[in-house]
Amino acid sequence: MIELIPAIDIIDGKCVRLTQGDYATKKVYNEDPLEVAKMFEGNGIRRLHVVDLDGAREGRIINYRILERIATRTSLIIDFGGGLKQEDDLEIAFESGAQMVTGGSIAVKNPEMFTSWISKFGSEKIILGADAKEKKIAISGWEETTSQELVPFIKGYYDKGITKVICTDIARDGMLQGPAIDLYKEIRDEIPFLYIIASGGVSSIEDIEKLSEAGIPAVIFGKAIYEGKIQLKDLLRFT
């Protein structure tokens, strides 16, 4: 059964969504992310993906107080990303209640440090964030596209011990046009034992079913819930 991971993206302490990572498209869905997290938990959800978009842009963890509130007032298993640049940032995230953290930009800009995190904290706590625009890795809140190819980038870190990756096709993020199933299949075929968490484009229950049928173990979704394209009660069949 595919693992369901709703996303809460945070700017100025509020639950927001962007379209294709563009901060100018910010739309506030709820003033209180804790309220959203409790709603998910009340509908059988066990995992949560929390992104500090302020942190991603500033290069330092900012919204850890929100993380702490969600972690102490729900039982959700939280992975946290955005602005993780130093080991101190990870310590703050873990102390604030995250069970896992996601590193994206840091894995490109400072591979030695990211690799040291895998060694120190273990692959069960460190998730690779591999966000791609036309199969090229994008970083810094998706505002910069690199020349690194997606699949070799992931494979390199798999060889260094990474077991989980969140892969976002930026072109589909927030567009509600369906996930990049062929891309995830390509990664799965190249790295069969990798735990792939699909992200971006989910617009319906049918999209989740297609990912499940394709053998993708987990999916992150956000806008489809916030825009009412997916009803929380419809997710119960997967939980």
From Swiss-Prot:
- Is Amino-acid biosynthesis set as a keyword in this record? yes
Known EC number: 5.3.1.16
Cysteines paired by S-S bonds: none
UniProt entry keywords in alphabetical sequence = Amino-acid biosynthesis, Cytoplasm, Histidine biosynthesis, Isomerase
Say if the entry is tagged with keyword Cytoplasm: yes
Q: Which GO terms describe its biological process?
A: L-histidine biosynthetic process; L-tryptophan biosynthetic process
Gene Ontology MF term list? 1-(5-phosphoribosyl)-5-[(5-phosphoribosylamino)methylideneamino]imidazole-4-carboxamide isomerase activity
| Reaction equations catalysed | 1-(5-phospho-beta-D-ribosyl)-5-[(5-phospho-beta-D-ribosylamino)methylideneamino]imidazole-4-carboxamide = 5-[(5-phospho-1-deoxy-D-ribulos-1-ylimino)methylamino]-1-(5-phospho-beta-D-ribosyl)imidazole-4-carboxamide
Pathway linked to the protein = Amino-acid biosynthesis; L-histidine biosynthesis; L-histidine from 5-phospho-alpha-D-ribose 1-diphosphate: step 4/9
Q: Where in the cell is it found?
A: Cytoplasm
Q: Name one GO cellular component term.
A: cytoplasm
Active-site residues are D9 (proton acceptor), D131 (proton donor)
The family database entries (Pfam families) matched by this protein are listed as:
His_biosynth
Family affiliation? Belongs to the HisA/HisF family.
Task: State the HAMAP family in the record.
Answer: HisA (MF_01014)
Concerning NCBIfam families, the annotation shows: 1-(5-phosphoribosyl)-5-[(5-phosphoribosylamino)methylideneamino]imidazole-4-carboxamide isomerase (TIGR00007)
What is the name attached to this protein's record? 1-(5-phosphoribosyl)-5-[(5-phosphoribosylamino)methylideneamino] imidazole-4-carboxamide isomerase
